[in-house]
Amino acid sequence: MLTKRQLLVLKEIIRLFTESGQPVGSKTLMQELPVHVSSATIRNDMAALEDAGLITKTHSSSGRVPSTQGYRYYLDHLVEPVRVSRHDLATIKQELGQRYSKMDEIVAQSAQILSNLTSYTAISLGPEVNNIKLTGFRLVPLGNHQVMAILVTNNGNVENQVFTVPPSISFDELEKAIRIVNDQLVGLPLVQVAQRLRTDVPSMLMQYLTSPDGFLDIFGNVLKSAASERFYVGGRLNLMDYLGDSDIHELKKIMSLIDADHGDLTELLGGPIRQTPVQVRLGPELKPIDLANLSLITASYDVGGHGTGMIALLGPTQMPYSKMIGLLDVFREELAKRLTDYYANFDQ
């Protein structure tokens, strides 16, 4: 069981490391802690935190840095959101208050505003997409091993694409696979459909298809088209500012995620639900890929009968969480107000 002072030391290590990017030593802590404590006592507290796995020692310095476990503990128990500055609040209100002719424009601009305010990569998901549910899926044979895949959603949207089916897969097998999809996935939000395509659905399809990959590709591509209409990313090049040359593989993974597959991006946002309006997930907690040196802050917003949407920030693990959580909480409220005002013109 950690003492209050040890938790204070952890909190201060995270603050100082966030600000400087440098390992934090006992002498620095002795100067920065709000209570007077000897250097020896601080070293003992740091040893206890290290034994608990909350901080770790770097090879190049005698200082300590937070571990992933330390950040998780901090986010779950210690973080205190900072009130957004008057300047940032005025910027949010002014930018969202511009004249927009389409809801898509508001959602797209929200990602750009958020990325400009934070210098991180911002992702914005419109309310209707986050609330769209699958209502049906079918394949229509066109001959010459071609089929038209048709996906229908509860907002009346119909997506269709033509695909070539491998000769090894018969249409009878495809019909059985379609029945599984409709039995298991109809009625679910598209976010959950994308998740289940990567978890339990493939094993179900194995009962009828020798290799379900071809069918999953067809369904996944149509799903991606249906789920990506109001999905916007702002500041994608900001990733290059906080990922160094040694993280080039990480950068390629993220760019591929953002540019190539909105189904994956939807799954990235759809993590485990916590009972807080703003949630933070660290690299190892992110799916479908582990983004080791990054964190994702997500916040949902409610537009009444028009559904719920989501905004998110993707940035370095050592981002200033207190500030970012406070900013995102205010931003989601202001975005919800702006979209509510927009819809009011059509609800009268």
Curated annotation (Swiss-Prot):
Coiled coil: none
Recorded superkingdom: Bacteria
Keywords noted in UniProt: Repressor, Stress response, Transcription, Transcription regulation
InterPro entries: DeoR_HTH, GAF-like_dom_sf, HrcA, HrcA_C, WH-like_DNA-bd_sf, WH_DNA-bd_sf, WHTH_transcript_rep_HrcA_IDD
GO BP, sorted A to Z: negative regulation of DNA-templated transcription
Pfam families tied to this protein: HrcA, HTH_DeoR
Keyword Repressor among record annotations: yes
Gene Ontology molecular function, alphabetical: DNA binding; DNA-binding transcription factor activity
Family: Belongs to the HrcA family.
HAMAP family linked: HrcA
Cited NCBIfam families: hrcA (TIGR00331)
Biological function: Negative regulator of class I heat shock genes (grpE-dnaK-dnaJ and groELS operons). Prevents heat-shock induction of these operons.
Protein name, as recorded: Heat-inducible transcription repressor HrcA
UniProt organism field: Lacticaseibacillus paracasei (strain ATCC 334 / BCRC 17002 / CCUG 31169 / CIP 107868 / KCTC 3260 / NRRL B-441)
